[in-house]
Regions:
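Secretory targeting signatures
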Residues: 1-28
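Generic detector of short, well-ordered, non-transmembrane alpha-helical segments enriched
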Residues: 17-22, 51, 57-58, 138
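Acidic/proline-rich low-complexity IDRs
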Residues: 4-10, 47, 87, 158
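Short, solvent-exposed recognition patches
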Residues: 33-131
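A short, solvent-exposed beta-edge/loop patch
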Residues: 116-160
Length: 160
């Protein structure tokens, strides 16, 4: 009887060890800087890094942490891609920065009909002005960056 109890305890200990080792490869930290889908968002002082693309956080802006999204399913023009998002706020002003990425990369970006070709911060892309918002999209390193702000100068500040 005693040998059977010891064997049962040993078997349970082995199962727990195997289960813990298997779970080590999974990320259970929802809202963390990285996740198992490959998404990443990091902030260090006034530098924001999303999917290894660097941005400047303009003076006075702070992250709205509840709006952070890491490796979520992309929608709209980038269906099938993942997206990591960071929202910066200063009073009533908001800057939304999204980086879309996919396993095979994103290679073709089509300019929307209502956009104009524009170079901001050294990046060639497309600027859309609609209902008081400015949206700038550009491709970099097989990813697509989208920045939405209430004015073009805020986009320029992010891309310095």
């Amino acid at each position: 009887m005693r040998k059977g109890l010891i064997a049962l305890i040993a078997l349970i200990a082995i199962c727990i060890t195997i289960g813990a080792a298997s779970a080590a490869d999974w990320s259970f930290n929802i809202g963390s800087d990285t996740n198992s889908d490959g998404g990443s968002v990091q902030i260090n002082n006034n530098e924001l890094k999303i999917q290894d693309e660097k941005f400047t956080i303009p003076d006075g802006y702070k992250e709205n942490e509840s709006a952070r999204d890491v490796g979520a399913d992309g929608k709209g023009n980038f269906e099938g891609a993942k997206v990591s998002v960071c929202e910066l706020k200063k009073g009533n002003e908001t800057i939304l920065i999204k980086v879309f990425f996919a396993d095979g990369g994103i290679h073709n970006i089509t300019a929307p009909a209502n956009s104009e070709n524009k170079t901001i911060g050294g990046h060639d892309g497309f600027l859309i002005t609609d209902d008081g918002l400015f949206t700038f999209d550009y491709g970099v390193n097989e990813k697509v960056v989208e920045i939405v702000a209430s004015n073009e100068s805020a986009i320029e500040a992010v891309l310095k």
